[in-house]
Amino acid sequence: ASPGASEFLKFCADNNVEVYYITSREQGEKTYEYALGHLKHLGFPYADTKHLTVLRDTSNKEKRQDEVMKDYNVVVFLGDNLNDFRRKYYLKNDVDGRIKMMEGDRDKYGRNYIVFPNPTDGHWLAAIFGDSEPPPTDANREIMKKAATKSAWSVN
């Protein structure tokens, strides 16, 4: 878990804020069992079947998020990928398109959308290359460097 995650989630629980875990992963038939066990092992609150959704066949979390939002006032989305917030960010080969989408939601970043760094997840690479595992060539390194140094918006 990220440093401070347990303390933050316990703070939420102590203040009557329910936490829903919506994840997409594929680890075979026991994927759900592994995910729930991991949350319990870490001592995270609301580690139960009501609050955990594991998507094995898709990374699209929006349907489940919308279901939760019907019954709850969702105050923040936490994730390591723009796709964790809304599906509209799932654009391949279109860094400029993702930036444009972010610009439309500018007021949500840092308030409703909190992005965690995670260099082990390659989904952000698909926005650049159309593939989460592009070949490690000099040309691809230059493409990645150019995309990584592009600013979504200037700081005012």
Give short role names for the model-derived ranges.
Residues 26, 30-156:
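C-terminal cap/substrate-recognition subdomain and adjoining C-terminal extension
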